[in-house]
Amino acid sequence: MKSLFHLLALAALALAPAALSAQTMPVQQPTPPDAAHRFDPPWNAPAQAGEAFTVYGIDNVPDLYGDVVDPQLVVFFGGNQFMVLDDLLREFRKAYPQYQRIFVETLPPGILAKQIEQGGALVVGNLRIALKPDVYAAGKSRMNMTPEWFARTSSYAQNRLAILVRKGNPKKVASLRDLGRPEVRVSMPNPAWEGIGKRIEDAYEKAGGAALKTAVMTTKVKAGTTFLTQIHHRQSPLRVLYDQSDAAPVWYTEAFYQAMLGHPVESVAIPEKENILANYVAGVMKAAPHAQAAEDFVTFLNSPAGQAVYQKYGFLPPVK
């Protein structure tokens, strides 16, 4: 299975400096993947100037996004929002054209927090990046762990859970309780560093009490029928698409996006009484190297243009 190392693999290409035009350094698209990697990310079509060298299964870095050289804004986003970036940054640049070189990471929020604690350093394969974020955005519970980091925070979106299954739902998964069945292979975010993992555990207890949580998170982990991911927003869809897992509890927007892509998946709704809401919060870092850019970006998230992007991808409006 594609691990964090596989999905992020080696170095992302730094974009050409802003002085180089698209005429001298044309936008290129990566070579389409072969059948064995036909569902591999990145799932967007990045319009970046430079020599395209994405090799699926080898050199493929979907969660490091944009300019690593002299960025004017650095954002650490919880990974489940990766799908908004193309539209969100395009609209942000329209509203604030002074910011063109932007670097974004969309990794699990717990990993991003560890990176911040190490001065912004991240090692992927042979690549080391050391960029301090201007903005850190994650679920409210994660943000509440480190209030001392932020000059200010702002809620900008909400989300809820769904269950991702293959087209046709071959195991007939109808509810969270079905994930406790021994024959249903589950892809589950690791609660150790993925905030969604703990929220899904809460949902298990709502749906089936401690017995369901124990079945999925203890009994089936030992049996090998629950797989704990390192980066669920990439691994869980891939495991379902490649028939390595039968079902994956995910954020609704992740299932929604896979359907937008035309991938052969379906979404199983979770009733409100068993579901949970996530409140996404963005914080301007006190130590932001680009403080004004951080302020402008967090303000933009709640602007009509910013909110329209989140609505397009199935997110709910923020807590008022």
Predicted regions and their residues:
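Positively charged n-region of N-terminal signal peptides that target proteins for export
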Residues: 1-4
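Bacterial N-terminal signal peptides
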Residues: 7-18
